[in-house]
Every structure is written in structure tokens, then in C-alpha cells.
């Protein structure tokens, strides 16, 4: 995260659990390629990671003003992700952009970029 004035910028936040190599909801083959994944588990994990980073930097979930979401499979994953997103953002509804991309640098299906106030 990077603080600029009263803003906090988070980028490249994925579902990997802190200080672990394991990615919740991802099964890899022997070559490290995604064999299967559970977008629901990844969504919950990425939101947990965002909350941790925000609080560690002196912000909070309710201070999020903008969310960019990168999904690797919009067709199959958007409805599940959107349902979970709505659960997390009941009281605070920031601006949001959801983009499908071909791949992410690690074997994950979702990554977030966040702007929050402090």
C-alpha cells in the first residue's frame, strides 16, 4: 500500500494467504498450472486481505472509494463474485470497475486495486 496525502492506494491484492504459498481455493497440477479453482473461496480471501492491509495502514473498509477488479473468467465467475461483493459492500458502495483479463502473474482468478481514504 502507498499513502499519498489522505489517500491510500492498494494494488495487486490477490487471494493468497499472508506469509503462505498456498492460494485458497486453487488446485495446481504438477507443472504449477491451475487444475481447478473455487472463485468463492478466492473472493472471500481477497476481501480479507484488503481489510487487513487497510486496517494495518490506518484506514478501514468503509473508507474505500474505488475498486478495480480483475477477473480471469468473467463468463463463469462474475455472478458469484458480484454476489459476494454485494455482501461485503452493503453499507459502503464505492465506484467499481470489473475487467476480464487473460491471466494474472500468479495462478489466481481475481485481483483487486483499491483506493481508500485514511
Question: How would you label these PLM feature ranges?
Answer:
Residues 1-118:
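Short, polar/acidic, helix-capping and beta-turn segments at strand->helix junctions
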Amino acid at each position: 500500500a502507498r499513502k499519498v496525502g489522505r489517500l491510500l492506494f492498494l494494488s495487486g491484492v490477490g487471494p493468497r494467504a499472508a506469509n503462505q504459498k498456498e492460494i485458497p481455493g486453487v488446485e495446481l497440477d504438477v507443472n504449477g498450472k491451475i487444475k481447478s479453482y473455487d472463485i468463492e473461496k478466492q473472493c472471500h480471501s481477497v476481501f480479507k486481505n484488503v481489510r487487513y492491509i487497510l486496517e494495518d495502514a490506518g484506514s478501514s473498509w468503509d473508507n474505500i472509494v474505488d475498486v478495480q477488479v480483475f477477473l480471469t473468467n468473467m463468463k463463469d465467475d462474475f455472478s458469484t463474485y458480484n454476489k459476494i461483493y454485494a455482501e461485503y459492500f452493503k453499507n459502503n458502495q464505492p465506484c467499481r470497475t470489473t475487467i476480464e483479463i487473460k491471466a494474472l502473474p500468479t495462478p489466481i482468478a481475481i485481483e483487486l486495486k483499491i483506493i481508500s481514504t485514511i
